[in-house]
Amino acid sequence: PLTSVYCLYRGGITGLIGISDGTKVAARYSYLAKMFPKILDIPSDFMKGGEVNVEEVLKLKPDVVFYNAARPEEGEAYRRIGLPAVCFRTEKYHGDPLGTIADWLGYLERIFGAGEGTAGVSDYGMKTLQMVRDRIAAAGDLKRPKAVIFAGYSGNQLVASGSNHYSEFYLRECGAVNVAAEIDGQKGVNLEQVYEWDPEVILINNFCPYVPEDFYENKIAGYDWGLVSAVKNKRVYKFPLGIYRWYPPSGDTPLCILWVAQQLHPELFSDVDIAKELRDYYQKFYHYEPTDEDIAKILHPGREAAIFN
């Protein structure tokens, strides 16, 4: 997800000489590649299956390497061969994606100086969050739907996001009950657990290969969705895929807050034109004017971005 924030910060792919294989897959099926087509030419073969070949990174002659703080051994490997390396945390703010991207933007400013397109991003995000909070608070005894976010699919099981993850932030702030709160982080869940929870709303991350129709048409092996409220009432939604997958922190995180709130409380946020918000945001911060077709594809993505080559 850092790549999308980097491109937002620098106004493009300037200085970017290597990206992860997962980032390239997401870019190929998102609008990152449409905005900056040459990102698909940036090398990613130094990483296979999530494992980094440090010697191959060295051949790229980077001035600095960014890596995930959850992989300290990777940072040590870079330093052993003399490469300056900076870690970026994805969980520093206990699942708050707004705090996370603000942190990342601060790091990038310290490294590169003033950014090209970031003035106002954090403010927009905080104003959006406050609007959602105020509207939910003003609604008084608003019914909070039971909801679950499926983050992926592993070991023939859907993976649910619980506490201490972005799901906690989105569902709490946007007015829902996280039925998977008993899970610390992410964990595979079976059919019996889903029946026990009986979520009224299901949100699907872009790391998960399924789309709402797979739930409605019972196409997920090992699961029968006919008795689940969210499926019976056609309240299964796929997270949008804009400049990156919207569930984790990205340049589009401020928009994601609005989108989640609207899926959970469509009547309360019926006046929000998410397509207009998206268009205005992209024009202001990415200097890119999406077409109606672009917006439709962003808001209703397919399954391709979950496929890692």
Give each language-model segment a name.
Residues 9-11, 58-59, 79-80, 139-143, ...:
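Extracellular/periplasmic catalytic domains that process cell-envelope and extracellular macromolecules
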